[in-house]
Amino acid sequence: FSVKDALSSKKYHTSLVLDFPSINKGGSFPSDSLSLGQSVQRLVGELESKKMKEILERKFQVSLKNKPVVTTFRGHSRMKDGKIHSDSKTKIITVLIYLNVHWNHKNGLLRLLKDKKNLDNYIQEIPATMGSLVAFKVTENCWHGFQSYEGKRLSIQLNYLYENALSQHNFRHKLSSFLKKFF
């Protein structure tokens, strides 16, 4: 499901952008490796809340009881990003929320796809604008991607994982985050 303006109170938009961690490289960065401002911490708290978990459980007919949640941030998109993929089998649910005040680009808009071969064969295109939220159940055919875009592109990704996948997921993200400091 998707919500075009999940952040109904526009008065927080500016503080979210100002409080968003400075990320000038591509890739996902775990929340615990970043310095988050107050409004972003508050938003992450809401996204990780029991209330949000219950909404996702009802919507997707899954139990998230005792399932770990991992939150990552993206601040910069590279030309190589956006390739068609389905999420890792370690994930149960993926939630993405975009925090870009303005988006005047035709590229960089997430597309939920009908197949793994054609970026133009999509079910829905998600705006990359402030408060656009999309959530989906991870399946082997939950194909998504976007037309290549390079530049600032702010988003928060929340994933509910299978219990035995947390250490593997954390290791991969921490190693990747560490290596990005050098490349």
At which residue positions do the language-model features occur?
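Fe(II)/2-oxoglutarate oxygenase catalytic core
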Residues: 1-135, 139-183
